[in-house]
């Protein structure tokens, strides 16, 4: 089924659902044996959506099974939004949206760099 799907769609990457979940409200339970089985029959590298909340040792193990890309949207959104929350808590009256937006983008960039470093280690 995997090889047929790739052949029929011509996709370059295949996003898989192996216990990964979107958001941070549900604990992911990644099925590494299933990921390994899929990797053996997939002619293209694999992608995992819902990477936020998955322990890095699981991600590193998953990379052994042709996992090329992991999406961390919730972690990056959390880094962005927490900037505003922390600033508001620190000083309710002195919140410059422009300055906070710049700081939020910097925080997202730092978080993204951290995730890339961990994944590539």
Regions found by a protein language model. Name each.
Residues 45-56:
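Glycine-rich beta-to-alpha transition loops that act as phosphate-gripper elements at the mouths
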Residues 47, 69-72:
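Short hydrophobic alpha-helical runs that function as membrane-insertion/retention elements
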Residues 1, 47-49, 101-103:
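Active-site mouth loops of central-metabolism enzymes
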């Amino acid at each position: 089924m995997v090889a047929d799907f790739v052949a029929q769609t011509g996709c370059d990457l295949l996003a898989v659902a192996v216990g990964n979940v979107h958001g941070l409200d549900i604990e992911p339970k990644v099925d590494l044996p299933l990921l390994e089985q899929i990797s053996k029959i997939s002619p293209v590298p694999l992608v995992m959506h819902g990477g936020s909340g998955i322990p890095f040792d699981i991600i590193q193990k998953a990379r052994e099974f042709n996992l090329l890309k992991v999406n961390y949207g919730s972690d990056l959104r959390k880094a962005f939004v927490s900037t505003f929350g922390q600033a508001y808590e620190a000083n309710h009256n002195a919140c410059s949206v422009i300055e906070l937006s710049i700081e939020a983008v910097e925080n997202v960039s730092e978080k993204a760099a951290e995730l890339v470093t961990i994944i590539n280690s």
